Amino acid sequence: SRYGGLKQLDGLGPNGETIMDYSIFDAIKAGFGKIVFIIRKDFENDFREKILNKYEGHIPAELCFQSIDALPEGFTCPEGREKPWGTNHAVLMAKDVVNEPFCVINCDDFYNRDAFQVIGKFLSELPEDSKNAYAMVGFRVGNTLSENGTVARGICSTDEAGNLTTVVERTEIMRVNGPVCYKDE
């Protein structure tokens, strides 16, 4: 990666807090009561030592593993693939431990407490028999750019009622002399 390491484990706060620690703190303050971490198996020992151990006894936490060959029946991993499948696949890996309304984040992005409060409110107001109810907290792409290179983002469009209509993956997004630009594939 451009970063050159596992930024999920690198401390940046005054007491070594990670970006993930700030998100977990904000999520707990917003009313979330359980954490499910989805990681690669080869990352387990470091993750338990640096992250999971600090939450034991404070909030229920589960650990699931994402593997590129863990696929639904009828699917196979293309030969030579090394890169993880992504967020949807990670969520699939947690299907046996998530039985309640939930929120998904990436642990190397900072969201802020307001984001957790918004999604927490949505989830807490769902009727008990709710199925297939979804929401997302969106951010203006210009507020998510890096000063250290390009980023990839899902660019969302909505209808007049605020319903999500499309998500288009854009790569190599950056600011060029003011405006936000991306590579047109």
Explain the meaning of each model-derived region:
Residues 20, 94, 108, 140:
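Residue-level signal for inorganic ion chemistry
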Residues 100-110:
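Short beta-strand-to-loop acidic/aromatic patch adjacent to the donor-nucleotide binding site
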Residues 46-58, 116-125:
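Short, electropositive alpha-helical surface patch
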Residues 1-52, 59-61:
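N-terminal glycine-rich phosphate-binding loop and ensuing alpha1 helix
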Residues 55-101:
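Short phosphate-binding loop-to-helix
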Residues 37, 63, 104, 136-137:
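Structural beta-sheet core signal
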Residues 113-185:
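Conserved core of the sugar-phosphate nucleotidyltransferase
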Residues 6-13, 77-81, 151:
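Short glycine-enriched, charge-decorated loop/helix-capping segments at active-site entrances
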